[in-house]
Amino acid sequence: MTRKTFTLFDPTLALPAIADAFRKLNPAVQWRNPVMFVVYVGSILTTILWVQALGGQGEAPAGFILAITIWLWFTVLFANFAEALAEGRSKAQAASLRGLKKETWAKKLAEPRFGAQWQMTPAADLRKGDVIVVQAQETIPADGEVIEGVASVDESAITGESAPVIRESGGDFSAVTGGTRVLSDWIVVRVTVNPGETFVDRMIAMVENAKRQKTPNEIALTILLVALTIVFLGVIVTLLPFSMFSVEVAGAGTPISITVLIALLVCLIPTTIAGLLSAIGVAGMSRMMQANVIATSGRAVEAAGDVDVLLMDKTGTITLGNRQASVFLPADGVSEAELADAAQLASLADETPEGRSIVVLAKQRFQLRERDIHALDAHFVHFSAHTRMSGVDMAGRQVRKGAADAIRKHVEALGGKFPASVSGYVDEVARRGSTPLVVADGTRVMGVIELKDIVKGGIKERFAELRKMGIKTVMVTGDNRVTAAAIAAEAGVDDFLSEATPEAKLALIRKYQAEGRLVAMTGDGTNDAPALAQADVAVAMNTGTQAAKEAGNMVDLDSNPTKLIEVVETGKQMLMTRGSLTTFSIANDIAKYFAIIPAAFVTTYPQLAALNVMGLASPASAILSAVIFNALIIVFLIPLALKGVKYRPLGAATLLRQNLAIYGLGGVIVPFIGIKLIDLAIAAVGLA
């Protein structure tokens, strides 16, 4: 997705949002927000009272009722505008995606190989399982998996990243997205989706989903706000008979008017957070989109904020991920050339970067030319997460390469023995933080290949920040325990899972969840799908398999596993924003008590004038100033709701103290200043 940024009140977003704010005045829309629905009903009632006042039957001056009515409607409109503006930012991002859905044609192959006959087919007619060829300067017509070839692909339309990426068969970079463009070479692609199910289609559906589901925390907060509203509604209902009784007993003043009661109710109920609550949720998803992460729901973003365990793959997240074969370490009685020959044979059909680096190293060290895999009449055994080894069966030979324990079991199952010298090499390589791969030819263990990887710069500091936030980091790797321990110590993670299988990952997630923790993880392979489906926050890589994307509740367009940390920070920022604005909204009430209560009852109880600490010009001015402030504060807080409260990697207790000081104390002080300034303005224009 092209990274187009918008200013907060960009005219291209603000003008449609204003129109949407009026459209949202539909009662069918308003009742979804119970607190703002009370304001909506109050606005209708004061409008009726104003019409009565025009006919000479008003309970208060028509001008006063009109002023209150206008600002009550503005309160509703400002809340609608905040939500519409947040939705507009997401819709603008969706519009750029819709531009990718142009009519394209595909070269559909009769057979799944390059060079086979093809026919031009509309992209809309492609079905899951069809095989197509895409050549230089052609647009990839549908989502799919590269099954042959390698090409440079421009994915800027989806990811916003201008640098082309390599997409090739095998490994973790085989997925391609419809709407991207091949810049050079060619690839044969197997289509993985039916029409209407493409990644772009799903992204558009996600960001344009009008009926956004409320998250559990949002529902809980809404219940609290509704409860407060009901309490204040009960208070307001009792004030009218209390006022009538007080006037009769005191023999002075006039009963409080319905208009003033409605104004008091609207000022006391938590309209600020109620008006911004939906906008905060939409903006959270929008911020994820700006980070090139598509969340399937606000629930996923919110869960990210509550996460306290991060499961991260070693390769690509903690290390650079470009492991390369660097050294052949032959077993006793085996020459280095023999080990290189066996390693190359076991890697001929291995399309992963590691497999190719073994073939290249054998060629560089011993001039072993890459052999024609078709001429060998061999059966290749591909790597799986369960066996944790790969290789070739040919001419009575079983050549395998893989993890030390997997090769040990394989050799012993065939009746062979695992040499102590090879175990020593495995431990030595592992202690260096490299990955040892053991090669065996039948029952004969040939030796060890060292795969070197490098821990990413700055990752240790990021993990230290997460630790301050109370988040536990766990590294997941297929490496043996010694290698995993060495890299874990270097990277600074709290724990690690070595020799990981899909079942082990799933069991670890369930263990943490049974302890009451929320778990986040990333994944890109089909073998990651069960764990992704179990995790509370599951970020699938865009380059990953279709199964991984469907199991996750977020998709990272940049396919950067380290993004998981940013996802968690964005989730925490959304929760902090909601909490901070709730605190501010409730703290606002103190100033409004001092403004409206004395104004409402001062004619009956003159002693209440002592509570007019702000020195407001008149009772009418005090009430109107409070109502105006109540409406305007929503507008002033829209930027904070959309941008989010500034997040710092601190402990929960420290963050709570800071936010209570800023938004709690600020919520008490700001209304006193705001209401007084509005009162001065009203007095200056002669409306007091």
From Swiss-Prot:
<dbReference type="InterPro" id="IPR018303">
    <property type="entry name" value="ATPase_P-typ_P_site"/>
</dbReference>
<keyword id="KW-0630">Potassium</keyword>
<dbReference type="InterPro" id="IPR044492">
    <property type="entry name" value="P_typ_ATPase_HD_dom"/>
</dbReference>
<feature type="transmembrane region" description="Helical">
    <location>
        <begin position="622"/>
        <end position="642"/>
    </location>
</feature>
<comment type="similarity">
    <text>Belongs to the cation transport ATPase (P-type) (TC 3.A.3) family. Type IA subfamily.</text>
</comment>
<dbReference type="GO" id="GO:0005524">
    <property type="term" value="F:ATP binding"/>
</dbReference>
<feature type="binding site">
    <location>
        <position position="350"/>
    </location>
    <ligand>
        <name>ATP</name>
    </ligand>
</feature>
<feature type="transmembrane region" description="Helical">
    <location>
        <begin position="35"/>
        <end position="55"/>
    </location>
</feature>
<keyword id="KW-0813">Transport</keyword>
<keyword id="KW-0460">Magnesium</keyword>
<dbReference type="Pfam" id="PF00122">
    <property type="entry name" value="E1-E2_ATPase"/>
</dbReference>
<keyword id="KW-0472">Membrane</keyword>
<keyword id="KW-1003">Cell membrane</keyword>
<keyword id="KW-0067">ATP-binding</keyword>
<feature type="transmembrane region" description="Helical">
    <location>
        <begin position="260"/>
        <end position="280"/>
    </location>
</feature>
<dbReference type="InterPro" id="IPR023299">
    <property type="entry name" value="ATPase_P-typ_cyto_dom_N"/>
</dbReference>
<feature type="transmembrane region" description="Helical">
    <location>
        <begin position="668"/>
        <end position="688"/>
    </location>
</feature>
<dbReference type="GO" id="GO:0000287">
    <property type="term" value="F:magnesium ion binding"/>
</dbReference>
<dbReference type="InterPro" id="IPR008250">
    <property type="entry name" value="ATPase_P-typ_transduc_dom_A_sf"/>
</dbReference>
<feature type="binding site">
    <location>
        <position position="354"/>
    </location>
    <ligand>
        <name>ATP</name>
    </ligand>
</feature>
<feature type="binding site">
    <location>
        <begin position="383"/>
        <end position="390"/>
    </location>
    <ligand>
        <name>ATP</name>
    </ligand>
</feature>
<dbReference type="GO" id="GO:0008556">
    <property type="term" value="F:P-type potassium transmembrane transporter activity"/>
</dbReference>
<feature type="binding site">
    <location>
        <position position="528"/>
    </location>
    <ligand>
        <name>Mg(2+)</name>
    </ligand>
</feature>
<feature type="transmembrane region" description="Helical">
    <location>
        <begin position="594"/>
        <end position="614"/>
    </location>
</feature>
<comment type="function">
    <text>Part of the high-affinity ATP-driven potassium transport (or Kdp) system, which catalyzes the hydrolysis of ATP coupled with the electrogenic transport of potassium into the cytoplasm. This subunit is responsible for energy coupling to the transport system and for the release of the potassium ions to the cytoplasm.</text>
</comment>
<dbReference type="GO" id="GO:0016887">
    <property type="term" value="F:ATP hydrolysis activity"/>
</dbReference>
<feature type="transmembrane region" description="Helical">
    <location>
        <begin position="219"/>
        <end position="239"/>
    </location>
</feature>
<dbReference type="GO" id="GO:0005886">
    <property type="term" value="C:plasma membrane"/>
</dbReference>
<keyword id="KW-0406">Ion transport</keyword>
<keyword id="KW-0997">Cell inner membrane</keyword>
<feature type="binding site">
    <location>
        <position position="401"/>
    </location>
    <ligand>
        <name>ATP</name>
    </ligand>
</feature>
<dbReference type="InterPro" id="IPR001757">
    <property type="entry name" value="P_typ_ATPase"/>
</dbReference>
<keyword id="KW-1133">Transmembrane helix</keyword>
<dbReference type="Pfam" id="PF00702">
    <property type="entry name" value="Hydrolase"/>
</dbReference>
<dbReference type="InterPro" id="IPR023298">
    <property type="entry name" value="ATPase_P-typ_TM_dom_sf"/>
</dbReference>
<feature type="active site" description="4-aspartylphosphate intermediate">
    <location>
        <position position="313"/>
    </location>
</feature>
<keyword id="KW-0633">Potassium transport</keyword>
<keyword id="KW-0597">Phosphoprotein</keyword>
<comment type="subunit">
    <text>The system is composed of three essential subunits: KdpA, KdpB and KdpC.</text>
</comment>
<keyword id="KW-0812">Transmembrane</keyword>
<dbReference type="InterPro" id="IPR036412">
    <property type="entry name" value="HAD-like_sf"/>
</dbReference>
<feature type="binding site">
    <location>
        <position position="524"/>
    </location>
    <ligand>
        <name>Mg(2+)</name>
    </ligand>
</feature>
